Amino acid sequence: PIKSSAASDVYKRQLLTVDNGDFAAEVEEISYDQIPMLDKDSAEKLGNRKLGELADMVSQFEVAGDYTQINYKGRPVRVTPLRYGDWIKWLNNRSQGLPAYLVIDMVTQNVDVVRLDQGIRYTTAEHFGRNLNRYLRFRYPTYLFDAPAFEIDEDGNPFWVCPRIRKTIGLFGGTDIAGAVLVNAVTGECTYYDAADVPSWIDHVYPAELIIQQYDYHGTYVNGFINSLFGQRDVTVTTDGYNYLAIGDDVYMYTGITSVVSDESNIGFILSNQRTKETRFYTVAGAEEYSAMESAQGQVQQMKYAATFPLLLNIADQPTYFMALKDAAGLVKMYAMVNVSQYQIVATGSDVAECESNYRQMLARYNLIDDSDANIPADTQEAAGVLSDIRTAVIGGDSRYYLRLQGESVYYVISAADAPQVLSLIHI
């Protein structure tokens, strides 16, 4: 704990610099066909299912739980290595190494198994001298490391990015990242880079948890140590939870910022580049993430779907929470968009295109965008079939009908206010 005014000033200034930003100008507007639809849990399900389809691997290997989110050739993906099923399987296969890694496209949900000419020999799940943490300890005995991140370069070569920790305030305080050791997962070749010199294809140098800790210091001691205890003028902290946003060739961590007095609203949020730690604060008063999740769940309350932690998007220059809605089995059934500033603006859809279309129409209805910007995406598909289930709910005074067709697992949502001519047929 920090116990002096001088120490608090050092923590505020030395660890993290936060600039103000313009969300609409700096965060590129994203189209429905570019929205990452997979959270880590869904990616894990797809990865395990894919491995189960490979007869030559499923009996010997398992999918490791890394699922690092990176930008790969301009696409947001999650990558993860394999691991040995048990000790016996390790003994039988260790000479060849792990034969492949998985790449999960977060937009298309395609899973690629990338087979390697030479197997991966250095991982966090290895044993003895090839265990990555032990390997680093012998190669760099004086370094302290944070948790390594599995990444691939633009040629698909697997690496471990191992951030080097340094203490910048006294002997034990002011944790920061001095640089990173890049370990070739196949050959074990190591290269150290200072933080400013890390190759641009690397996405994870500064862990999200460290950035959050540093911002909390920054927000707590913004007006000094005494103010952090008494008065607490302008004191802010991060909200619970965070997610990632792809901007350009980099991955940014974002989290909400709220006042130190616990409430259910944000005063804004930060975006922090996980390669450079460049951090910007965006003033957008609105709902905090869990309130937005509850709003989305309220739209489909009769389905009892659970919302994933939201992704922050720019839709029509509006900061927007996007999330998947899952059933009790963890399967994605619908998608939701919630306006950050006005979280009563909630739209859902059975696919992302429908969800965005409904959301844009609601923005136009609230006069946040022009009608010309509320067009339905060109390739939105019509659904036809025999109704197998109809459910109703009244939300905000508006009757909503949830329709399911025979042979499908998703529900289509129709508002009585928006389509009375269609709903009249339902009562025939």
What are these model-predicted stretches?
Residues G397-V413:
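OB-fold (S1/OB) nucleic-acid-binding surfaces
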Residues I376-G397:
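Structural detector for short beta-strands of small beta-barrel domains
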Residues L15-V198, Q274, N339-Y343, A347-A353:
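Soluble catalytic regions of membrane-associated enzymes that act on cell-envelope
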Residues P1-A7, Y11, I426-H427:
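Single conserved hydrophobic/aromatic residue that forms the stacking wall/gate
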Residues D418-I426:
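Short nucleic-acid-contacting surface segments enriched for D/E, G, S/T with interspersed K/R
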Residues R78-R83, F159-I165, V251-T258, T320-K326:
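Short beta-strand elements that form the blades of beta-propeller/WD-repeat-like
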Residues W90, D263-I270, L331-A336:
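Structural motif
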Residues Y244-E294, G298:
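Long, repeat-rich segments with strong aromatic
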